[in-house]
């Protein structure tokens, strides 16, 4: 019960975007990735903004889905989309989804969890998988893991209080 209450408090920004916290719980159950880790990654990647877009390294935070769709229609292949910032150029085609499909929060979190679980298995560890979720470059992995770890630790601290 405490975990649910903490997740609810931590996810108030998510609810503000009209996103159900249940998405993260469901994706966690389906993928085996701890819900706290999914939340930490989403926090680092998008600040829980389901419309967040990264265009070749430049973050954009549209205020609506309509605005996000317009940006995506004009974007190239190197674009990260949504709560989990799924890279369409790498994963969209492999998984058979469009850029606009990735704006669906349920699909985005589920795919992000699926991708992360593949990296965790391939790299034989949670944090190695987290680093690779972000980049194949070791230095970028270390920086990313540090950011996710800080967010993850804050979530765990709230859960344990």
What are these regions (language model features)?
Residues 3-13:
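Sec-dependent N-terminal signal peptides
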Residues 17-161:
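Catalytic glycan-binding domains that act on GlcNAc-containing polysaccharides
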